[in-house]
Structure formats: C-alpha cells, structure tokens
C-alpha cells in the first residue's frame, strides 16, 4: 500500500521536505530530517493503532530501561535543527530522540525509546515541539505572573524582587539574605523553575557576597540604586569569585560616566546588559553600542519589540510609573523622555535579525509583559522577513535559520548566560524535559501542552464537568504537575554553588536545588546563532544608528500577526 504525502502527513505528521506555516506569520518551517524512518512502523497510540501489547509496545519494564514517556512523531524545533522525531523521557529528563517502538519486532528502534507497559504516550503528530521558554528579566512584583508566563510557554523565570514595593517595581533585585530566603520559600508553591538576582549595587564586596551565599544566582546592578563604575567593578569582581552572572541596567542620566566609562569598568569581564536598546534604561542615547563588544551578552525587553506605531505613545507613561517619577517634576519628565528614541527602537529590530542582540526577555510589570516574550519574538521575526526578505542562510523554500535564530533568543541563550544550560534550554538528552507542544496554527501564541520535567503542567482544558475534555469553556488550566508534592519534584530552584556547598540556604526547602555554573568567561560567541559583533554608533544629535558604517532602521508596524485574531475570546 502506498500513501500520498498528504495522506501520510495527516496520519503521522510532516516528514522531510514538508513545510509548515507558523500560525498567521509569514514564517515557513521545513522538516530537515526524519528520525522516525523507515516508514510503515510509526509509533501511534489509539484504537486500532500500533502502540499496543505485542506490536509497538514491548514487554520491557521500567527496570529494564523503558522510558516513562514517549512523545511520538513530533516536529522537534530547536536551535540546532528541525527534525521529525519521537522523544523519550525518563526520571524527568530527556533520554533520547529518534524512533520509538518495540525492538523485538521493529527495526531501527533507538536505544532508550523502547516502549513498555509503563510508558505513557503523548501524540505529537501534526504538532511542533520546542524547549520551554526562559525569561531572565523578571521583576517579581506579583506571584500571578507565573501563571501568565506558564500559559504562554515559559517554564523558567529568573530575576529579582519582593512583591509590589517601590524597589521591586523599578529594579530586578531581591536585596539581602532575609528577602532572598523568604522569596525562595514563596516560590516553592509555583510550578516553574526560578532563580533570584541579589542587589549588586555596592562599592564594597561583603554585602554582595552574603547575598550569593544566601542563594542568589547572580547580581543585578540598577541605575536607580546607582550604577557607578565602582559598583560595576565590585559586582563583577565578586561574580568572578563565585561563578555567578551580573546583569546591568546602566546609567541613563550619564551622571557617573558615559557608556565608554561603563564599558571600561567591565574590564573585559562577562556581563548581561538588560534592554540594550535603552528605552528600558541605559546610557542615553548610545547604550546600544554595547552589542558590539565580545564580553557583553545583550538582551531586549519586549515592550519595544517589535517596533510599531504604538510603541512610542505607551512608553512615557510606563516609564513614569515604573521608576517612581512624577509628571509634576520637570526633571523627572526630562529623564523619561531621554530614554524614548524612535530611531534606536527601529534599529533594535534589525539588530535582532542580524543576530547582534542575543536574548529576548519581558521586564515583567516593569515596562514589560510577562506573557508575551514568545509572542513578540515571533512577531519580530515576521516583521523582519516582511521588511528585509529571507536571510542569506535561508532559501525561498523555508525560513529555518531565521526561526532557529529567534527561538534561541528565549531558550538556549538565556540558559547559557545564566549558567543553567546543563539543565534546560534545549531538547537534548540529559536535560530536563521542560517542553512545549504547539499546534502550528497557534504556534508562538497559545501552547497546546506545557510539560515540566515530562509531567503535564498546563493546557487549554474544557469544562471539567463535561463528558469529554473539549467542550467550552476551554481555558488554560493548571494540571497535576502544578499540585501537591509533584510540583516540588518537577520544578527546580537555581541557586549559587557556594550557597549549596556552605549551607547558606533556608531550612525546609522541598524543591530540588540546582547550582548555576560556567557563567564567567562567556563571550558573545557562546550565544547560539546570535553572536554577531557589529560596530554600532548612535548619532548624539539625530539618534540615527550606524552598523559598520551603514545606517539601519525599520518602519513601525501597523499590522502584526499573533494579535487580535487570537484573542477574540
């Protein structure tokens, strides 16, 4: 019996050469390899299907190596490629990608994917599997942020804060050991991975060291606490000693120096620059220059992404609220206005498309939207293809390289930058199975299924009193991985290695504690598919942006995909 490509795609999902449009964007994904081949013995669950006893299900017990979960026939999209594969999970970690089934009667079954009676199945055919998103610029203002992020496909959040205090609404810091401990305790009840940044603003090391020893995974320098060269040098010196990252919001007012002085204070040491365009804060008007330095790992925050006809209008009020400014004080208004430049906003989109800005983050409730990191990343990719055409690495058939570049901005690159890439950030054996399944029509905007360590944590679910799962009202709802002791088994807390070794953490934490590592000595070249180092200049009078001597800009978008069409109900 022979199947047409169309019939095979309907039954088993796309294979090599099949192409998928991502939601209502202009982005086309093409399957590059099919690891479930040869055809004819696909693992498919359901009535009359193959995953049955003696067929694609073997007699292997868990003790004999059968996986706990197999996701079948998914299109795996990650920074490293686009493949059709079955994915196996055991003990919460990915064990293999390849062909699942029963090796007693099937050829080519991948070791680790031998389906047994103890194996659960999630059907991935016709769906796209990506790593869970990682948002590393979180103001922990409200615990409800976690649900908004989770329901958008984010599974890891790092940042700082203590709730809706003035300090937290403006800065991404959890200051001092007492608050770090209380926040570590509070975050135990939310079903995502978390890590906390301590306050990095000090000219002497002792107060910074005690925060790292209390569990902080890094330090945040913020201009509202004083981002002076002395502060920068001290924070980076401490970070080098303890192998943690430093994130910085630089000095918008140029009070203690200009961008050149800040770059000099880095002394070539690795640092993560938040909202590198500057509307979120940073040396006016030319903080954007930092994206051309090899020791700088730059990110954007999502309110400026992508640049639209509405971007300018909303920023002034946002800024006044977030930074405790008064519209009645002329100096406060001037401070706010100095950060809002359409020219640098327009250039930011292009710098992302060139791979010069490596990460995308939210800046949650502090000039950013926690549930829109993924959505705005793909809106930007769409806008750039619309304006700039295919990337040189792509063809007229697909946008695979551009898609992988943009995916890396909220998955593997923030994981690398903050020392958690050995645990999360990509779909590779050995990493935790923090995964998101998407129907192509809803890709990037509404996930189909979110897993934490291989356990379903969230999904659109119909009326719980209905006879089947699908009747309206269909809403995002937490699933079993979000409850009871299971939550603490499949969601992890990142802490410093020093805190684990020296016993500086609060007693009674129930979650698995994982140390951050390998944050120092990173360079832009470690940012997957986003390692460009252009020379960037900003004209101090006109704010025009030059990249390697050529002016770059983009038009404000009037219409975007992944917008009202998906939020009518």
Swiss-Prot record:
For the ligand (Ni(2+) 2), the binding residues are 220, 249, 275
Q: Which Gene3D superfamilies match?
A: Metal-dependent hydrolases, Urease, subunit C, domain 1
Give me the Gene Ontology terms describing cellular component.
cytoplasm
Q: Name one GO biological process term.
A: urea catabolic process
Pathway it acts in? Nitrogen metabolism; urea degradation; CO(2) and NH(3) from urea (urease route): step 1/1
- GO molecular function annotations of the record: nickel cation binding; urease activity
List positions binding Ni(2+) 1.
137, 139, 220, 363
| InterPro entries found in the cross-reference section | Amidohydro-rel, Metal-dep_hydrolase_composite, Metal_Hydrolase, Urease_alpha_N_dom, Urease_alpha_subunit, Urease_AS, Urease_asu, Urease_asu_c
Name the top EC class.
hydrolase
Catalytic residues (UniProt): 323 (proton donor)
Reactions it catalyzes: urea + 2 H2O + H(+) = hydrogencarbonate + 2 NH4(+)
Q: Which domain of life is it from?
A: Bacteria
Q: How is it modified after translation?
A: Carboxylation allows a single lysine to coordinate two nickel ions.
**Alphabetical keyword list:** Cytoplasm, Hydrolase, Metal-binding, Nickel
Reply yes or no: does the keyword Cytoplasm apply. yes
Cellular location of this protein? Cytoplasm
Domain Urease as annotated: residue spans: 132-569
**What EC number(s) is this enzyme filed under?**
3.5.1.5
Query: Which family does the entry's similarity section mention?
Result: Belongs to the metallo-dependent hydrolases superfamily. Urease alpha subunit family.
Q: What is this protein called?
A: Urease subunit alpha
């Amino acid at each position: 019996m022979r199947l047409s490509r169309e019939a095979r795609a309907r039954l088993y999902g796309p294979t090599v050469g099949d192409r998928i449009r991502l939601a209502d964007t202009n982005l086309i994904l093409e399957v590059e390899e099919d690891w479930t081949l040869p055809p004819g013995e696909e693992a498919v669950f359901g009535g009359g299907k193959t995953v049955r006893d003696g067929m694609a299900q073997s007699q292997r017990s868990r003790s004999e190596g059968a996986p706990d979960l197999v996701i079948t026939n998914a299109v795996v999209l990650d920074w490293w490629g686009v493949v059709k594969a079955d994915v196996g999970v055991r003990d919460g970690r990915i064990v293999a990608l390849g062909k699942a089934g029963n090796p007693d009667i099937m050829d080519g079954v991948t070791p680790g994917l031998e389906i047994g009676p103890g194996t659960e199945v999630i059907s991935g055919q016709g769906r796209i599997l990506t790593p869970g998103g990682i948002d590393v610029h979180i103001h922990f203002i409200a615990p409800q942020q976690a649900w908004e992020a989770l329901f958008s496909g984010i599974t890891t959040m790092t940042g700082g804060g203590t709730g809706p205090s003035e300090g937290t609404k403006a800065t991404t810091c959890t200051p001092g050991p007492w608050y770090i401990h209380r926040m570590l305790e509070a975050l135990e009840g939310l079903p995502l991975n978390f890590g906390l940044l301590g306050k990095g603003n000090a000219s002497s090391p002792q107060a910074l060291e005690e925060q790292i020893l209390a569990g902080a995974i890094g330090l945040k320098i913020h201009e509202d606490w004083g981002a002076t060269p002395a502060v920068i040098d001290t924070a980076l010196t401490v970070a080098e000693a303890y192998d943690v990252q430093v994130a910085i919001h630089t000095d918008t007012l140029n009070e203690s120096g200009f961008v050149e002085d800040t770059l000099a204070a880095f002394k070539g040491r690795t640092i993560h620059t938040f909202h590198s365009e500057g509307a979120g804060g940073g040396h006016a008007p030319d903080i954007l220059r930092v994206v051309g330095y090899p020791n700088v790992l730059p990110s954007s925050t999502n309110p400026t992404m992508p640049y639209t006809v509405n971007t300018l209008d909303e920023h002034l009020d946002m800024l006044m609220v977030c930074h405790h400014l008064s519209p009645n004080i002329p100096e406060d208004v001037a401070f706010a206005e100095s950060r809002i430049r359409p020219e640098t906003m327009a250039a930011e989109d292009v710098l992302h498309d060139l791979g010069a800005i490596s990460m995308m983050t939210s800046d949650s409730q502090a000039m950013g939207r926690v549930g829109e990191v993924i959505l705005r990343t793909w809106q930007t990719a769409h806008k750039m293809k619309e304006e700039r055409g295919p990337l040189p690495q792509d063809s007229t058939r697909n946008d695979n390289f551009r898609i992988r570049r943009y995916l890396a901005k909220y998955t593997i690159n923030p994981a690398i930058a903050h020392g958690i890439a050995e645990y999360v950030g990509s779909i590779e054996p050995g990493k935790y199975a923090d995964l998101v399944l998407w129907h192509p029509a809803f890709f990037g905007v509404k996930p189909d299924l979110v897993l934490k360590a291989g356990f379903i944590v969230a999904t659109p679910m119909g009326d719980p009193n209905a006879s089947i799962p699908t009747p309206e009202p269909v809403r995002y709802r937490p699933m079993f991985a979000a409850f009871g002791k299971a939550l603490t088994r499949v969601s992890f807390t990142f802490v410093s290695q020093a805190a684990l070794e020296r016993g500086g953490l609060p007693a009674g934490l129930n979650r698995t504690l994982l140390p951050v590592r390998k944050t120092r000595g990173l360079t832009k070249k470690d940012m997957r598919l986003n390692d460009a180092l252009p020379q960037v200049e900003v004209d101090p009078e006109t704010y025009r942006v030059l990249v390697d001597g050529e002016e770059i800009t983009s038009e404000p978008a009037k219409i975007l995909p992944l917008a009202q069409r998906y939020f009518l109900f």
